[in-house]
Amino acid sequence: MVPVVALVGRPNVGKSTLFNRLTRTRDALVADFPGLTRDRKYGRAEVEGREFICIDTGGIDGTEDGVETRMAEQSLLAIEEADVVLFMVDARAGLMPADEAIAKHLRSREKPTFLVANKTDGLDPDQAVVDFYSLGLGEIYPIAASHGRGVLSLLEHVLLPWMDDVAPQEEVDEDAEYWAQFEVEQNGEEAPEDDFDPQSLPIKLAIVGRPNVGKSTLTNRILGEERVVVYDMPGTTRDSIYIPMERDEREYVLIDTAGVRKRGKITDAVEKFSVIKTLQAIEDANVVLLVIDAREGISDQDLSLLGFILNSGRSLVIVVNKWDGLSQEVKEQVKETLDFRLGFIDFARVHFISALHGSDVGNLFESVREAYDSSTRRVSTAMLTRIMTMAVEDHQPPLVRGRRVKLKYAHAGGYNPPIVVIHGNQVKDLPDSYKRYLMNYFRKSLEVMGTPIRIQFKEGENPYANKRNTLTPTQMRKRKRLMKHIKKSK
């Protein structure tokens, strides 16, 4: 098993900064703002080729109230999940009562714990950490996470020896293929098409929507545990949380995201970062669950978010939440509104659920798998060309400047979303109505559901363009005789 390392401590001691440093990412939101991290965030890290899982947690200070109570519960759960704990304290702020309370809890759990004093840059490390020895956790390791000072020493002299004791190096991670593919995607590289098997990779499933529509409640319902903070307050989730899971022998990576509001209502800098993370999560996902509040109906912001999903080419499943408790008359009105405002999304499945009570949640995954399979299915050039030919036979392309547009052949240009490339003459002059006709024809013929189809057109090149006709010697002699004859006749 890959060791699990949890970062715990008071708010704003630098846990997310160290998390980003260890995982070599910027996945965790970082700001000089206590209480920014609210959910457990997992990341992959390594030291000298040895991998471990790092968990970033929300701060604990003993004065939690409201949503902060749920944050503290998440941090305590992370301690239970971890094999080793890095207990972080703030060297600049000094020893606090909350530090003593956390240390007491850690001692009661009897977990391997290492005390890390952060923010020692510009200070005498020995002098800055002396008060923390009273916590009774042994050696103290001074670092400056924001600049990386002391982090490598922490890994080499603390984590690596501990890992050598508890995890033999010969152990192979059974998820290595997934993480290798993840690294390839992150670096912008692409594996050869012959080696690609979409069924061998986890389906990345993003749950998005406006604030407080029930995204985290749905996430917890799917997982069957209180994995993310749920509170009846808009903006509870601030970061995108990636959660591996398995259902019906199929692997998924569930992505719970922050709510997206109208741009004019986003005033907090942290919320702006959260929105960016949500949009990045959409682009990173294979399938997106767009959650809509049945009691509030479809807003312009829902349509804006829907537009971003479609422009990103992601597969889509629409989820209407909070369906329980509505009268039959209201339900009919909601369905009519959906048909009217979302009529152009005829390829997406719509589910009416209650995330709180779990009604119809289990049926979501059938639509998710259908959408993913449609977006990654391989189709041969012969099949696509045959479909294109049938479409032309059923409805001829229009005349352009007196000439009929000619479509020659079609082939696949990409997947997730499926891209069909059509070659022909004057194809760029085709009207939008005929392009939509072709797109719908391909969708029906291929039985594509849950994912948009994109069609690209390429003009056939004229082989004689920009070439001069060079006469042969015989043609030159004939031309001279012809010119002489013309001159004599004049």
Curated annotation (Swiss-Prot):
Domain EngA-type G: 3-166, 203-376
CDD domains the record matches: EngA1, EngA2
GO molecular function, one term: GTP binding
The entry's keywords: GTP-binding, Nucleotide-binding, Repeat, Ribosome biogenesis
GO BP terms in the entry: ribosome biogenesis
Entry superkingdom: Bacteria
Gene3D superfamilies associated with the record: 3.30.300.20, P-loop containing nucleotide triphosphate hydrolases
Residues given in the record as GTP 1 binding sites: 9-16, 56-60, 118-121
Binding-site residues, GTP 2: 209-216, 256-260, 321-324
Ranges where the KH-like domain occurs: 377-461
Described function: GTPase that plays an essential role in the late steps of ribosome biogenesis.
UniProt xrefs under HAMAP family: GTPase_Der (MF_00195)
Family indicated by similarity: Belongs to the TRAFAC class TrmE-Era-EngA-EngB-Septin-like GTPase superfamily. EngA (Der) GTPase family.
Subunit structure: Associates with the 50S ribosomal subunit.
Protein name, UniProt field: GTPase Der
Protein's organism: Salmonella gallinarum (strain 287/91 / NCTC 13346)
Lineage: Bacteria, Pseudomonadati, Pseudomonadota, Gammaproteobacteria, Enterobacterales
